[in-house]
Amino acid sequence: MKANQLLKNLVLTELESAVSSYLTKQKIDLPLTEFKIRIEYSRDEKFGDYSSPFALENKNILKLNPKEIAEGVLSEIKNETLFEFVTFSPPGFINFRIRSQFLIQYTNQVMSPMVTFAKTDEKQSILLEFVSANPTGPMNIVSARSAAYGDALANLLLSLGHTVKREFYVNDYGNQVYLLGVAVLLRIFEEKGEKISFQEDESKESVFTLIEKRILPKESYRGEYIRDIAKEVLSNKTKSIQVEEWIQNKNWDECIHDLSKYAVEYNLSRQKEDLKLFGVHFDQFFSERSLHEAGDVENVPTLLKKEDVSTIDGKLHFLSTQYGDDKDRVIRREDGRPTYLMADIAYHFDKYKRGFTKLIDIWGPDHYGYIARLKGAVLSFGKSNDSFLILIAQQVNLIENKEKVKMSKRLGIFQTMRDLLSYLGKNGKDVGRYFFLMRSSDAPLDFDLDLAKDESDKNPVFYIQYAHARICSIFRELQISIADWSIPKVVSGDCFQSEERLRLLFWVARFQEEVYDTATNLEPHRLTNYLQSLSKAFTKFYSHKDNRIKEKQGEEREQLLFLILFTKRAIASGLELLGISSPEKMSKEDESNT
């Protein structure tokens, strides 16, 4: 289906037509583009399904009071097939109630025989890069949030008809990776019975001198996971012999480089395991080292505009202030070594070279200051500003017993993604993903561990899953196979006159536009909010004694089954887009009200 076929856009089309007729009668010679014409959901359902603040937002240009404008537009709305009623409410809203028969026909069209999604007219080839955690240790909680956000976003973009590839950028080159190798070497000494100490204050002593003194540099890594890597090295006979030879010969540099590579591979394999547990798949893990080895990083100055590159005090600078940055950035040091920015520019150029028309990066909260320089580089090598989008997955605060849980990476006292999944148990994937997606990604998130552990319907993800499971239980109790049940050819609006039935029908009919808006705005939390509201509407319907389907016969039973089947499809499809399961059986669904 196309976006203009979405229910709210059908309403918008009628409103635009009515406004056009109204303007003609008023002899106002202005195009529709001069006016703000929009549709929103009614803030109070008693007034209708949709409303428009057209009269309020255009009173100045029309030089009339909102009531007069609204009533004039109302008189031009004639579509009785679509609308049950169209009314005015102060101070200037036009309200629309959709006819139940139209909702039934519309829902049947977009939800049967399978759920369809509205497609964009401007399909793109998108490279979505997310997580990209440093391979210097386990993934932290912010990486888990980024994983949930990025994976859901990829699913939503696919629903619009885009081509989407998921990519994880592996920072396997540079000083931090080297320091990882240093940490592993010191832990190897410790595992062999030697005493090591930890540098607390920085000194001018070289890394090699500190190694010989068995001192772990302050800027290196101290987490317990480093011990695990050291043990892995020592358990590998061939590797252990090679490392011992380097130690005896004090061949520190070669030893550190080798251990760095080994540790990166070890950590990356563990990260991949965690992502798999979280239900996150990547099409490619792209190595930073490969860019250096191919000469792509050294080639960066030739990609940028000549006037955007300058040597200052022996260092090569990208003049990023020309693109809104607060200062120009070094891309090559005096000794010839490239900076991280130089590698990142090479990486993003490579993305475009592979044929992608849209790049979306999801970064952590500590990268805000990096946006202007990299966006500037993309503009400098000739790409449009719209072709590169950077999204931020903000900080996560773990809350337990109403208090924040402390996290610190290098000291080894932080909570990892694996810790969280383990803590949440068998429901870790579903609960974790939902909780990370409940709030806008650009706002800090308080992750309530106690609520996440709660397996009752107080837990928002279980509340939705229980609704789905209850619907499945109704079909089971009636001994009807959902897969084989034939949807009635004719569904009458006569059975949908009660408030609970009408509200549920409307919430189901909204599904496609909710998904479309969620996807186009890149905001998965909108879909979690919708699924909560849909499940709430179903629970209200389910709890009413007049909706006990088992007690109904003939046409009414069939039409109520029609309603709950499409409710089930909306819930299941929505959860699938978020990467969350929709179980058909759960313990609480046995409390049947069939």
UniProtKB/Swiss-Prot annotation:
It is found in: Cytoplasm. It catalyses: tRNA(Arg) + L-arginine + ATP = L-arginyl-tRNA(Arg) + AMP + diphosphate. SMART domains: Arg_tRNA_synt_N, DALR_1. Its main location: cytoplasm. A motif ('HIGH' region) lies at residues 133-143. Belongs to the class-I aminoacyl-tRNA synthetase family. This is Arginine--tRNA ligase. It comes from Leptospira biflexa serovar Patoc (strain Patoc 1 / ATCC 23582 / Paris).
